A protein has these predicted regions:
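Bacterial N-terminal signal peptides
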Residues: 11-18
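Surface-exposed amphipathic alpha-helices with a cationic face
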Residues: 305-313
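Catalytic nucleophile-elbow at a beta strand-turn-alpha helix junction centered on a G-D-S/GDSL motif
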Residues: 202-227, 248-251
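Oxyanion-hole/transition-state-stabilizing segment in secreted/luminal serine hydrolases
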Residues: 218, 247-300
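Short, solvent-exposed loop/turn and secondary-structure capping segments
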Residues: 149-155, 216-222, 253-257, 290-292, ...
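N-terminal secretory targeting modules
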Residues: 2-3, 13, 24-208, 218-220, ...
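Catalytic His-Asp segment of secreted/periplasmic serine-dependent ester chemistry enzymes
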Residues: 262, 288, 325-401
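Structural recognition of the beta-strand scaffold that forms the well-ordered cores
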Residues: 204-209, 213, 241-246, 276-282, ...
């Protein structure tokens, strides 16, 4: 009797361990995300998205066998009708084409069609899909008749989206050659995030930034933002989520383009799935747009950093501070602006507020003229070029491993 009880207890213990292991392999983590924005007429296709299909390409960080897609109408004032959404492997030779054998349609509450309500975002149902690390994934949205004039979007996709008209009231087939032949734009529409089922220990880093993070100066469709290089370097060793939440022209405190970081932080950073690390690399525009009262603006920027750091740490997120890179040679540079940058960078390095520092300033500045970027890393003395972004991404990877 005693032996039977011992055996039963052992079986229960083993079953419990097995279930725990299964749960650890079965949690959602973010593999891709973008910061959604309110768009203007200049950011939309020449014609509306109504009764058209839009194929959009994203570069995921790590893979898995189950995924879900988050769509957003958070800045829309009207519903968005969607007939269907499907994903597929992007053709390796032609960005607008897909491998038709890999097409899989997403469902929303068990249905292909869905309506995105104004001010809302929603996830698709779970989709079994063999997603690979570093993959270029095509996401095609077949829009219905009713779409707003200004879609919730991300302006700086740095990839081309391919838009085609429906035929006889029906979306064209996934393999239709019309993709790439009608209208092409370099924006994303209604896309927000992709999550993958993975091990609970898979790390995820979110990056809060401006145009340097958003990829100004990169090569369209080549996926050479510094966060792309970061994702590739990290995933060469193990699965690692890298989420780029940069917005071109964005500020931390106020002003700039789109909602400032202080306003968008809860949605764009804390709202992502499974984030356990955060890089704050923003402040260039707060400094560059400053027209006076420089010391006060720098102090305010630091005070806002403290708020963001506290919010992240309250959620158990490790926070990395990235120093602001040089601007000499660009129109934003002046003695006073440089003094602000030095003041803020000094605080980032020495305050002890961040868990760790990623010193991009020291990395990419010209040793002979430290207020200026190295010539080989920049084409406009403000943003980096692909060579500079590669150096940044690989450097950051060593800090984040």
């Amino acid at each position: 009797m005693i032996n039977r009880k011992k055996k039963l207890s052992l079986m229960v213990a083993l079953l419990s361990l097995a279930c725990t292991g299964l749960e650890a392999q079965n949690v959602w983590k973010g593999t891709w995300a973008t910061a959604v924005e309110k768009t203007g007429k200049e950011d939309m296709p020449k014609e509306s998205l109504s009764n058209r299909s839009c194929r959009q390409i994203v570069h995921v960080s790590f893979g898995g066998n189950e995924m879900r897609l988050k769509l957003s109408n958070e800045f829309g004032k009207h519903p968005v009708e969607i007939c269907s959404v499907y994903v597929a492997d992007t053709d390796k030779d032609k960005n607008s084409s897909i491998n038709a054998k890999t097409v899989k349609y997403l469902k929303f509450g068990g249905k292909k069609n869905v309506v995105l309500e104004p001010g809302k975002a929603l996830y698709s149902d779970v989709l079994k899909y063999a997603l690979k690390s570093g993959q270029r994934l095509s996401i095609t949205i077949d829009y219905g008749e009713k779409t707003p004039k200004n879609a919730t979007s991300h302006r700086g996709s740095r990839t081309t989206s391919y838009i085609v008209a429906q035929v006889n009231g029906k979306p064209v087939s996934p393999a239709d050659a019309a993709f790439g032949q009608q209208e092409n734009v370099d924006h994303w529409y209604n896309l927000s995030a992709i999550d993958v089922k993975t091990d609970a220990k898979t790390p995820v880093v979110a990056v809060l930034g401006n145009s340097i993070t958003d990829g100004r100066g990169t090569t369209t469709n080549m996926h050479n933002r510094w966060t792309d290089f970061l994702a590739d370097a990290l995933n060469a060793e193990k699965p690692y989520g890298v989420l780029n939440l940069g917005i071109g022209g964005n500020c931390v405190v106020e002003g700039g383009i789109s909602e400032p970081a202080m306003k968008r932080f809860d949605r764009d950073i804390l709202g992502q799935t499974g984030v356990d690390k955060l890089v704050i690399f923003e402040g260039t525009n707060d400094i560059g747009c400053c027209g006076g009262n420089y010391e006060h603006v720098a102090d305010t920027l630091v005070a806002c950093y403290k708020v963001l750091i506290a919010k992240a740490k309250a959620k158990g997120i490790k926070v990395y501070g990235a120093t602001i890179t040089p601007t000499k040679g660009n129109g934003w540079y002046s003695y006073w602006h440089e003094a602000m940058r030095q003041q803020v960078n000094e605080w980032i390095r020495k305050s002890g507020s961040f868990d760790e520092i990623i010193d991009f300033d020291e990395l990419v500045r010209d040793p002979q003229d430290p207020q200026r970027l190295k010539a080989e890393y920049s084409d406009d003395w403000l943003h980096l070029n692909p060579k500079g972004y590669e150096v940044m991404g690989k450097f950051a990877a060593e800090k984040l491993k």
